[in-house]
Amino acid sequence: MCALAVPFDFTPVDPCENSYVAIGRVRYNDAVPMPTLLIVDDDATVRGMLYDLFSDRYECNTASSADEAFQYMEVEHYDAIITDIAMPGITGVELLKRVQLRDEATPVILISGKGSEHDNQSLLALGAFAYVTKPFSLDEIEQVVERAVTGK
């Protein structure tokens, strides 16, 4: 008889919730690891909605602040990051800049409740993969994340 032990690092998905995910591991019995997605928003409702939308196709972690996101990034590489721009403390734009210093190939999708075409152009010039204004449709954000992860 042969036994196989697989270590799992369980980390809270959201400090507001009492749920956990295995970071960087194969989920369920899938033979191929799921793409990883980090969702950063100080609004628990938006965070939860995005987690619910993507968690069946992506290994998702959520963070309520950029500082918390940095902690996740210390132990995990993400295939894409979605972040709100207007957060207390470190903004989503600053998060984008720090992600680029670490790994400029990681696509960062910025979301905001306020925006203009000028904002869109300037944020893309800073290196954002995309800029999506709230309210956005679920189809729209799904398509943007899919393009970010697949590179298409």
What are these regions (language model features)?
Residues 58, 74-76, 98-105, 126:
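Conserved phosphotransfer cores of two-component systems
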Residues 65-68, 91-94:
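Acidic catalytic/metal-coordinating carboxylates
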Residues 76-82:
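Active-site beta3 strand of CheY-like receiver
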Residues 87:
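Receiver (REC) domain active-site loop signature in two-component systems and cognate sites
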Residues 94, 115-130, 143:
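Alpha4 helix (beta4-alpha4-beta5 surface) of REC/receiver domains from two-component response regulators
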Residues 136-146:
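C-terminal output helix
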